[in-house]
Amino acid sequence: MIAQPPISPDESHSMRHRRRIATVSVIPTLLTLGNLICGFAAIHYASKPIGPSNVMGWSTLTIAGALVFLGMLFDGLDGFAARLTRSASEFGAQLDSMADMVTFGVAPAFMVLRLVSYYYGGPEHYTGILGPDADNAYGKIMWGVAAFYICCTALRLARFNVEIASTDEADHRFFRGLPSPGAAGAIASLTLLHQHLMVIQFHEIPPDGFEKTSSLLL
């Protein structure tokens, strides 16, 4: 049996340092996965019938929009955690883009289809009136617009990954064009308008409500 040479103090310190970095680098990965889960949950809630829920009286579509904004928070925190722990890597960049594709690509497009189908076809309709097999041009066009948005998001994220060949996190602080979270935030903001319209629909406003509110503000 060949005896192993003793490990020097410097090598022992280096091994402990690598183990610590490997442990700490899990934090950015978990934050990125949190973004991915938010996107999946947003699609889940958007697929439900639109109406008031048990969550603060919000509609299911409003919850989906809030989850997109929560995904934006996770998307910002994972980059901050990677810079803080100096654990930026190609793996993290690719995983981040995959999570962004779901939360900021597929989820907002599906939310728009649900919102349009609700106001165009009535509360009893889902997305059946929209799609390539719809019996009207409007339904086909709206489905095509949503599909075009998803394609643009995929191309935007792929271009970002290809252009950023370096693993230096400082290079990821600059964008060309509109970042996908910004576009998704603009679409998710429509759910806030939808929530406001639902409040007006289910709670009758008195005739003099506007005058009273204006007087109070003055």
Task: Locate the predicted segments by residue.
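C-terminal membrane-associated helical module and adjoining short loops/tails
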Residues: 1-16, 168-218
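Interhelical loop and helix-boundary elements at the membrane-water interface
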Residues: 2, 14-36, 82-101, 141, ...
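Multi-pass membrane catalytic core of lipid/isoprenoid biosynthesis enzymes
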Residues: 30, 66, 84-157
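Alpha-helical transmembrane segments of multi-pass membrane proteins
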Residues: 68-75, 148-156, 191, 218
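Short helix-coil transition/hinge motifs at the ends and kinks of transmembrane helices
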Residues: 49-61, 116-143, 164-169, 195-213
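Membrane-interface helix-boundary signature
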Residues: 17, 21-28, 57-64, 89-92, ...
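Topogenic membrane-insertion module of multi-pass membrane proteins
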Residues: 1-76
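Membrane-interfacial alpha-helical segments at the cytosolic side of multi-pass membrane proteins
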Residues: 40-47, 105-116, 186-193
